Amino acid sequence: MNIKNILLKNVKNALKPSNLDLRNLKIKKTKFKKFGNYQIDGIFSILNKNKINLNELLNKILPIINMKLINVSEKIEFVKPGYINIFLKKSWIEDNLLKIYHSNKLGISKLKKKTIIIDYSSPNIGKEMHVGHMRSTIIGDSISLILELLGHKVIRANHIGDWGNQFGMLLAYFNEKQNLKFSEITCTDLENYYINAKKKYDKDLEFKKKSQFFTLKLQKKEKDCINIWKKITNLSIENNQKIYDQLNIKLNKTHIMGESLYNDFVPYIISDLPKKNLAINKSGNIMVILNNFKNKQGKSMGVILKKRNGTYLYSVIDIACIKYRYDFFKAQKIIYYTDSRQSQHLLQVFDIVRKAKYIPNFVKLEHHKFGMVLKKDKTPFKTRSGDTIKLSDLLKKSKEKAKKLIIKKNPNTSIDEIESLSQAIGIGSIKYFELSKNRETDYIFNWDNILSFNGNTAPYIQYAYTRVISLIKKNKLKNKNNVKFLLKKEEEIDLSICLLQFEEIINDVSKLGTPHILCNYLYDLSKTFSVFYENCSIIKTKEESVKNSRLFLSILTSRTLKVGLELLGIPMVEKM
C-alpha cells in the first residue's frame, strides 16, 4: 500500500496521451493540511518545456487528472504560484485501512527480488569492538531487515579484518614472548599485545622487518602461523558474537567473510590487471594509476596493490572480494556501510573493478557512508584518557542507567521485570539514538537524550506502544470479525493517513539506506496517535460502530509500531 506510487501511476496514466516526458514528475507529501495530503511536483517544468500555458493546464489537463483520481481524491486543487494539491477521499482511506488490517505485514508489497549483499560491522580481529563499530553494525543490520521484508535475498557479509600486516605484528610479538599461553589469553590481553606490537613496529626497524616477514609467512599459509592465527581469530569472533547477541544483531558465524577468504583469489588479480593494461610495475610495486582521481598537486593518483616486499594491500583484497561476490553469489547490488573516511578508497576500488570488467554493468556498488560519534565538545567520543570506548562497556552502562530509571519511575517493579525492561530499554535506546540520526552526519552522544521519555527516542516509542496495548486490553471488541472503519473526526483521518504511509516510508529507507526516516515516522505516528487518543474517546463513545472503528485504528497503530521497531532491531515491551 504505497500512496505515492498509486497517485504517481494514476497521474502518469492521465497524462500519457499528451506524449509529455514525465520522468521528472513526482508526488510528495504536503507540509500543511490546508494544502491537502499530497502534491504533484515537477509538472510545471514539464509544461513549460512543452509550452503549455496555465489556461490549458486548468481547462484541459487538470480535469483529466481529476477524472483519473476520482476514486482516490476528494478534490484536486491548483494553488498559485504552481502547485497541484491532492485531498484524499475518506471512503478510499477507509477501504485501504481495511485492506492493510487483513493483510500480512500491514500490506507491504514485495518488490522484484534481487540478490543484495550488505557489508557491515566488519571489526578487526585482535581488538575488542568499540564505539566506532556501532554505526556500521546497527545501521547495516536494520537495512538488511528492511530489504528482506521487501522480498529481496539479503546476504549479510561481515568482512572482518582477519588478515594482513596487523597479524604479522602480532605473530612477531608472540615470537618474542615465548612464555605466552594461548589458553589463558583474553580479548583484552590480545588488544594490549597489539598496542605494544604496534608501538614497537613504529619505532623498531628490526621488529618492522620481522613483522613483514611473518605477514609473508601467513600469506603463504605456513602451518605454525596459521595455527596461531586461528586461535586469535576464534577468540575475537566469540567475543564479538556476545556483542551482536546483546544488540539483537542478526550476524553470526555463518556471515563471516573476512579478508582471509579472498587470499587465494588475490594472485589472479595481480596477474590479470597488468594483462589488461590496468596495472603497472613501478619500482617493484604493482599499482594502478587512476586518471580520474587527483592528488592535491593535481596529479593522477596511484593505488598500490602489491608492495615490492611481496605483501598485498587492502585495495587488492577488496577488488578480489567484489569479484568473488559476483562470481559466487551473483550479487545484483553490494552495499558497504563504512565511515566517510573510506569513501575515496572504495570509489577507487569500484573504479578498478569496473575497468577490469569483473562485474557486469548492471551490478550496483554503493557506499552508504556515515559520520562520527562525538562528545558534547564535538571531539571524538573517547574515554578521558583518550582511549576508544569499548562497546561492551557502553552497553553495560546503558543497561545500568535504564535500570535506575525504571526503579525511579516504578519502585514496585519485580526484579525479573527490571532485568528484562533494562535490557529492552537500555539496549533499544542506544540503537534507536544511533538509527534516528542521519547517517551522513556526525552526531553528539548524550546520555540524557538517549534515555529520555520525551522526544524522538526509543523509550518514548516503546511507552507509546504500551499505552496503545493497554487501551486495547481495557476496551475489548464485541465483534472482532466485523471489521469496519468509520472516520468521523479530523484526528481519525490524520491517524489513518499516517498508518497508510508506512509502506512508502519503508521504500524510501530501502532506496537511500537511511533508517532515520523510519525513526521520524514512528515518532510522528506516536504523536499522531496521542492527539487521536485525547480527542477521540473510546470509552465514552456510545455509538458501537464508531467505538469499534477507533479500536481497530488502535490495533493497526500497535501493529505498525511493533513492525517498525522490529525493523530497527529494537525489542517491544508491553508494560513500562
UniProtKB/Swiss-Prot annotation:
Compartment list: Cytoplasm
Swiss-Prot/TrEMBL GO biological process terms: arginyl-tRNA aminoacylation
Motif ('HIGH' region): 123-133
Coiled-coil annotated spans: none
Superkingdom per UniProt: Bacteria
Keywords, in A-Z order: Aminoacyl-tRNA synthetase, ATP-binding, Cytoplasm, Ligase, Nucleotide-binding, Protein biosynthesis
Enzyme Commission no: 6.1.1.19
Enzyme class: ligase
GO cellular component: cytoplasm
Catalyzed reactions per annotation: tRNA(Arg) + L-arginine + ATP = L-arginyl-tRNA(Arg) + AMP + diphosphate
Molecular function GO terms recorded: arginine-tRNA ligase activity; ATP binding
Main location: cytoplasm
NCBIfam families in the record: argS
Family: Belongs to the class-I aminoacyl-tRNA synthetase family.
Quaternary structure, from the entry: Monomer.
Name recorded for this polypeptide: Arginine--tRNA ligase
